[in-house]
Structure formats: C-alpha cells, structure tokens
Amino acid sequence: MVRLASCVLGFCLFTASALFAAAPDQTDKDKFIEAINTARAAVVEALNRAPLGFRRILFVSAIPEGFAAYQPRANNIFAPDEPLIVYTEPVGVAWTKDGDEFSSKLVIDFDIRSPDGKVLAGQKSFGEFALSAREEPLDFMTHIKLDVTGAPAGSYILGLTIHDTKSGKSTTTDLPFEIK
C-alpha cells in the first residue's frame, strides 16, 4: 500500500513538474493552483492509506508552539523536578466528514516502566486530542507533558499508546529516559 501511495504521489509530482515545464508563462496562477491541488490530493491519499504511527516523536525542551515549531532536547536526561514534554506528529489518522468539516480524535494512554518492564505508573485515557478542519490536514501535531516529580533517579521507559477513535486503530511507542 505504501508503494502504491508513493507511486501516486510520484506521478502527481511528475505531472505537476511537466505542467510547469510545458507552460512558458510561469505566472499562470490557475496552473499552479491545479498542480498544488493535485499534489495535495496525492498526499491526502497517502496519509489515508498509511498505518497509524508517528512521523516524528521526541522529547523537547519546551511546549511546542505548533507544527514543526519545537526545540529538541539535547538528550533524554531530566532533572528530578523537570517535566517530560513529548512532541509527536501522528500519521495515518482517520478523518471523518461531519457536515462541512473533517474531524479526528486521538486518545492517549501512558505508562512509565523500569528497564526490566515493570510498570511503575500510568494512566489510560490520559489525554485526548480532537481536531476539526474544513479539509483533511496534511500535518498534525500533539504534545504531551508529564510531571514526574518525586520519581527517584534512574532509568525509565515512557510508553505511549495512541488510540484513533475514528478508525479503532492503536499504535504504541517507547521513549527511554533518565532522571539524574
């Protein structure tokens, strides 16, 4: 399926570049808009076919200001009173048409485990992210902030599970971290 989506996207981009090369007048706005819409439709199709997962997920040093507006942490070592802040870019999110808008809803579970897998803390349905838009978004981000104050120094694993309530799909990822 991913190969098909790549072929569709590649064909659309090839078509768009051929359109630009064939048009001697680069200021023809309608042709540019048509090419952009064709490429956008191919990206939406690829995103709709993608399994639920993360394009990007990492610890960041502050609450992100928006999509791709984050500061990655230099490492995964946290002070005892420092919150864990995770930036995510989910992909494969299901969007359903509700009237004039598309909507999605993700529910987050987390657990904190020892390196040997023992669950030390956690919560089901810890966070919920719902989004509505006039068009299916190409880019989507969330962030998660966890207060681990009081946890002793040591190595841990943050397990995050995201449930897509529209599709019924889930995905899990682990982020190792230390408290020093």
Question: What would you call each of these model-derived segments?
Answer:
Residues 7-18:
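Bacterial N-terminal signal peptides
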Residues 23-180:
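Intrinsically disordered, low-complexity terminal regions enriched in Ser/Thr/Pro/Gly
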Residues 1-5:
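Positively charged n-region of N-terminal signal peptides that target proteins for export
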